[in-house]
UniProtKB/Swiss-Prot annotation:
Binds 2 magnesium ions per subunit. Its EC number is 1.1.1.86. Its cofactor is Mg(2+). Mg(2+) 1 binds at residues 217, 221. The gene is ilvC. This is Ketol-acid reductoisomerase (NADP(+)). The active site is at residue 132. It comes from Escherichia fergusonii (strain ATCC 35469 / DSM 13698 / CCUG 18766 / IAM 14443 / JCM 21226 / LMG 7866 / NBRC 102419 / NCTC 12128 / CDC 0568-73). Involved in the biosynthesis of branched-chain amino acids (BCAA). Catalyzes an alkyl-migration followed by a ketol-acid reduction of (S)-2-acetolactate (S2AL) to yield (R)-2,3-dihydroxy-isovalerate. In the isomerase reaction, S2AL is rearranged via a Mg-dependent methyl migration to produce 3-hydroxy-3-methyl-2-ketobutyrate (HMKB). In the reductase reaction, this 2-ketoacid undergoes a metal-dependent reduction by NADPH to yield (R)-2,3-dihydroxy-isovalerate. Belongs to the ketol-acid reductoisomerase family. NADP(+) binds at residues 45-48, 68, 76, 78, 108-110, 158. Substrate binds at residue 414. Keywords: Amino-acid biosynthesis, Branched-chain amino acid biosynthesis, Magnesium, Metal-binding, NADP, Oxidoreductase, Repeat. Residues 209-344, 345-484 form the KARI C-terminal knotted domain. GO terms for biological process: isoleucine biosynthetic process; L-valine biosynthetic process.
Length: 491
C-alpha cells in the first residue's frame, strides 16, 4: 500500500492540508438522530473506545463492542470494561455483519489487521469510522468503495471526553469524510451525528480532512505536546541539580511546574501565562523564548518535513515490523534518567513559586507552542487546526506528567506519539545543551529580583506577545468554548 498523501498531486495535497471550517451550532440541530435506530459496533475498548461508547449510548444510540475471540474467552481488560458497563459484547463474526457503523478505536499499529479482518464482514453500504486518520493517510489502507469512511477526533484523552459529557458539555472535535469513500454522500451526516453523540458539538467542531488531522496531530504530539515537555524536563532537572538544588525539590518543581504553568495557558493563552511573571521576569522569559525559537526552528521544520513526506511514518512502521525495538529501548532509557528516578519532595511549593522559579520553563512553553503553530501554518495547515494541536492540548499532557512523571505521559499517549516524542527529545536535548550552559541566575530555580524596567521595552514585548497569530485565534476559540459551556450549563 502507498502513503495516501503521496499519491495526491500538489493542488490536492494543499487543498486537504488547508481544509478547516469552524461549524455553527445550528448545523447540529438534529443531534445524533441520523444514527438513531442504527447499529453502531465499536472495535476496541480502551480509553477512547469505552468513553466514546458510554457517551453515544447516553445519547440514545445502539452501541455494542466487537472483540477478538481470545479477548472474550480469556476475559481480558477490554471484555471486562465493556461487560461491567452493561454493553453487549461479541466476536467480529457475530456483530460486524449487522453493523451500520463500525468504529475502529484500536491503537494505530493494530488498524491494518483490524480493518482487513472486519472489511469482508461488513455489509454493503455500511460505514467505517476512525478517531485518527493514520491508517488511511500514512498506511494508505484501501477501503471497499461501497463503504463510507468518516472520522470523529476528540481533541482530548478518552477520560476527558466522558467527564465533559457528564458535565453537560463536551470537548473540541475534528470531523472529516474520506473523499475516496463517500459513495452515498452521507459521510458528513454520519460524522455530525457521531460527534453530537459524544458531546463534541457543545464545545466546537471543526470540519477538517483526514490529511489535515493526521499531519497536524503528528506534528503537535512530536514537538510541543510531548517532545518539548520531555526534553525540557530532562534538561531543567539536570541543570538544577548541577547548580546545587536538592534533587527532590528540583524534581517537584518540574513535575508539577508544567501543569501549573499551562493551566494559565489554558485559561488565557500565552498572554496570561506571561502575565503571571513580574515585569523583569517577563522580559527575561521573552528574551529566552526568542533565543530558543532561533535554535529549535530547524528541528521543528525537520519534524514537519518528515511528517509531510511520510519519512516519519515509514520509519515508525519499520520499527513496528521489528517488534518495536527502538521504541522499547528509548522507553527503557527514559525510565532510567535522573529525573525519573529522583526522590519525591515532601514539602509544599506554592503556585506562584512555580512561575517565579520557572522562568526558563515558561520560555520553553512559549517557544514550543509558537514554533509548532508557525511551522504547521507555514506548511499549509489552517490556524484553527494548528491551535488545537499545540496550545489547546498542552495542559492535558502536562497533567499526565504531574501524575507520574514522564512514565505516565508515555503510558497515556499513543505508541505513535511516544515514538515521535523520543525522536524529538533525543535530538533536542543535545541541541539545547550549549544554551543551557549560558543561563543566568534567576532563569531557573531562583526568582529574578524586582527592579527597574524600560517602559518602551515592556510595551513592545507585551504587544509582541498579544499580537501573535496563535493568541488571536486562541482568544476566538476559547471564547467560543466558554460561550458554549454557558449554554450547556443553562440548558
Amino acid at each position: 500500500m502507498a502513503n495516501y498523501f503521496n499519491t495526491l498531486n500538489l493542488r490536492q495535497q494543499l487543498a486537504q492540508l488547508g481544509k478547516c471550517r469552524f461549524m455553527g451550532r445550528d448545523e447540529f440541530a438534529d443531534g445524533a438522530s441520523y444514527l438513531q435506530g442504527k447499529k453502531v459496533v465499536i472495535v476496541g475498548c480502551g480509553a477512547q473506545g469505552l468513553n466514546q461508547g458510554l457517551n453515544m449510548r447516553d445519547s440514545g444510540l445502539d452501541i455494542s463492542y466487537a472483540l477478538r475471540k481470545e479477548a472474550i474467552t480469556e476475559k481480558r481488560a477490554s471484555w471486562r470494561k465493556a461487560t461491567e458497563n452493561g454493553f453487549k459484547v461479541g466476536t467480529y463474526e457475530e456483530l460486524i455483519p449487522q453493523a451500520d457503523l463500525v468504529v475502529n478505536l484500536t491503537p494505530d499499529k493494530q488498524h491494518s489487521d483490524v480493518v482487513r479482518t472486519v472489511q469482508p464482514l461488513m455489509k454493503d453500504g455500511a460505514a467505517l469510522g476512525y478517531s485518527h486518520g493514520f491508517n488511511i493517510v500514512e498506511v494508505g489502507e484501501q477501503i471497499r468503495k461501497d463503504i463510507t469512511v468518516v472520522m470523529v477526533a476528540p481533541k482530548c484523552p478518552g477520560t476527558e471526553v466522558r467527564e465533559e459529557y457528564k458535565r453537560g458539555f463536551g470537548v473540541p472535535t475534528l470531523i472529516a469524510v474520506h473523499p475516496e469513500n463517500d459513495p452515498k454522500g452521507e459521510g458528513m451526516a454520519i460524522a455530525k451525528a457521531w460527534a453530537a453523540a459524544t458531546g463534541g458539538h457543545r464545545a466546537g467542531v471543526l470540519e477538517s480532512s483526514f490529511v489535515a488531522e493526521v499531519k497536524s496531530d503528528l506534528m503537535g504530539e512530536q514537538t510541543i505536546l510531548c517532545g518539548m515537555l520531555q526534553a525540557g524536563s530532562l534538561l531543567c532537572f539536570d541543570k538544577l541539580v548541577e547548580e546545587g538544588t536538592d534533587p527532590a525539590y528540583a524534581e517537584k518543581l518540574i513535575q508539577f511546574g508544567w501543569e501549573t504553568i499551562t493551566e494559565a495557558l489554558k485559561q488565557g493563552g500565552i498572554t496570561l501565562m506571561m502575565d503571571r511573571l513580574s515585569n523583569p521576569a517577563k522580559l527575561r522569559a521573552y528574551a529566552l523564548s526568542e533565543q530558543l525559537k532561533e535554535i529549535m526552528a530547524p528541528l521543528f521544520q525537520k519534524h514537519m518535513d518528515d511528517i509531510i513526506s511520510g519519512e516519519f511514518s515509514s520509519g515508525m512502521m519499520a520499527d513496528w515490523a521489528n517488534d518495536d525495538k527502538k521504541l522499547l529501548t528509548w522507553r527503557e532509557e527514559t525510565g532510567k534518567t535522573a529525573f525519573e528516578t529522583a526522590p519525591q519532595y515532601e514539602g509544599k511549593i506554592g503556585e506562584q513559586e512555580y512561575f517565579d522559579k520557572g522562568v526558563l520553563m515558561i520560555a520553553m512553553v512559549k517557544a514550543g507552542v509558537e514554533l509548532a503553530f508557525e511551522t504547521m501554518v507555514d506548511s499549509g495547515i489552517i490556524e484553527e487546526s494548528a491551535y488545537y494541536e499545540s496550545l489547546h492540548e498542552l495542559p492535558l499532557i502536562a497533567n499526565t506528567i504531574a501524575r507520574k512523571r514522564l512514565y505516565e505521559m508515555n503510558v497515556v499517549i499513543s505508541d505513535t506519539a511516544e515514538y515521535g516524542n523520543y525522536l524529538f527529545s533525543y535530538a533536542c536535548v543535545p541541541l539545547l545543551k550549549p544554551f543551557m550552559a549560558e543561563l543566568q541566575p534567576g532563569d531557573l530555580g531562583k526568582a529574578i529580583p524586582e527592579g527597574a524596567v524600560d517602559n518602551a521595552q515592556l510595551r513592545d514585548v507585551n504587544e509582541a506577545i498579544r499580537s501573535h497569530a496563535i493568541e488571536q485565534v486562541g482568544k476566538k476559540l476559547r471564547g467560543y468554548m466558554t460561550d458554549m459551556k454557558r449554554i450547556a450549563v443553562a440548558g
